[in-house]
Amino acid sequence: MKTLLLLGALTAGLVACGTDDTDGTNDGGGSDATNGVDSPFGNKDGSGSSDGGSTGDSCYAPVDMYIMQDRSGSMGDDCNIGQTVNSKWCHAINALSGYFNSTAASGNAAAIQFFPLPNQSNALCATGTGYDVAALPTPPPAYTTLPTNTFDSLLNSQNDQGGGGTPTEAAIRGLTKFTAGNRRGGRVTIGVLVTDGDPNGCDENLTNLSNLLQAHFQATTLRTFVIGMTGATDANLEQIAQGGMGPLHAATVGPLTNACGTSAAPCRHWNVGDGDPQAFIAALAAIQQASDGCVDGGGTVNPN
């Protein structure tokens, strides 16, 4: 229940517009006056409208997110949604299902792919081919509107046995191609990379990987967020996330008490430990809030 309340509080910011953020940045502070709880990227004056309308000082800029989920062998044992197998994979698919089905995500949309692909090879490293196509939905449309249980059957059918290694370069190239090629007017497009490991296979140079995301941001103004799970090195993920240009956030964000892991706060990547569903959902909700195109420092709203 605490998680769903947090989701509701964070999502309320998606329809707030015309606020006055005195320093023009998202500093991890702020209070949501409507809900009476701290919002990690909330409007400081609490004056935002929540009616989702297009008149007055309100606006509506929902988020389209492309999630690239690690399914390397280190994610642990397989399970189905609702089961409580103590593995990062099981935690992750339960958290993703919880977020996709939550009414707090209403109006936003998602697409998902997994890495490594079963046919992963070195030839895919420099192109991202296959990773630039969602496992769900099968376009058109490019994204599935939330909330929905449409993803549940896919999550149950997948497992943590991809083609071997953690080909982060291929995943990033596919993610950036997908988000650049699937921008819908009046909405904010973001990429979300979720991994429990350091790059293993393809280009493993952290500067090069960060530069791929930086070049994507400079060309498109689209942000890429990085979520790390136990097994990944926080310093490495933070270096990659710097290129993605997600807003800086504090170490404590809602129920997340170690959101930067071992990296100094504020940081850009998100640490969710072993993928505890409450922490994972809270991170997705905070990322959604950080992408709010209706507040200073939020995501870029795609032109109509």
Protein language model features and the residues they cover:
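Sec-dependent bacterial lipoprotein signal peptides
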Residues: 1-15
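Ser/Thr-rich, Pro/Gly/Ala-heavy low-complexity intrinsically disordered linkers and tails
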Residues: 14-58, 219
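VWA/integrin I-like adhesion module and closely mimicked acidic/polar interface patches used
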Residues: 36-44, 162-166, 170, 197-259, ...
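Von Willebrand factor
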Residues: 39, 58-141, 171-175, 190-195, 224-232, ...
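C-terminal "exit" segments of structured domains
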Residues: 58-59, 254-304
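Sec-exported extracytoplasmic/periplasmic mature domains
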Residues: 73, 97-105, 117, 156, ...
